């Protein structure tokens, strides 16, 4: 037969209190929101990189990059912009809406007919492809964040 071991109940109770404090109520809600914002920041980083920039001759006076700048509303960093986005909470679902307000964004994303209606310009699918990549990587990203959060609870 095995022998009994020693258990320090004070440390166990302290761990229980710390776990309850860190994983309930508003603390849990803010953790989930930070996870959503991190995923949004990663999505923005990928979609901004994939968004094409128009090339114009210098003499035209046009400047390319309007569509790319549209992802952040003209603000400089995608990560900083993602942190400023509002997280909507519907039941047990957290939603961040990422929109490019540039009027021709959907045409570049999905493709469109040519001006003379005799051809088709293929879409770039910058959002669709980026969303798929983030969706595939999300479990690992969230697992790492959860491990880090639980690690904070184990530090007594």
Could you describe each region identified by the protein language model?
Residues 1-156:
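Short, Lys/Arg-rich flexible segments
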């Amino acid at each position: 037969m095995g022998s009994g071991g020693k258990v320090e109940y004070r440390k166990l109770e302290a761990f229980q209190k710390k776990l309850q404090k860190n994983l309930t109520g508003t603390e849990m809600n803010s953790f989930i929101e930070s996870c959503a914002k991190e995923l949004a920041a990663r999505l923005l980083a990928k979609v901004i990189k994939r968004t094409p920039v128009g090339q114009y001759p210098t003499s035209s006076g046009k400047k390319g990059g309007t569509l790319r700048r549209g992802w952040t509303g003209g603000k400089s960093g995608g990560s900083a912009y993602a942190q400023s986005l509002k997280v909507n909470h519907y039941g047990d679902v957290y939603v961040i809406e990422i929109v490019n307000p540039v009027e021709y964004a959907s045409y570049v994303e999905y493709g469109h007919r040519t001006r003379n209606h005799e051809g088709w310009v293929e879409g770039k699918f910058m959002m669709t492809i980026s969303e798929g990549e983030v969706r595939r990587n999300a479990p690992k990203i969230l697992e790492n964040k959860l491990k880090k959060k639980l690690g904070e609870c184990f530090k007594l």
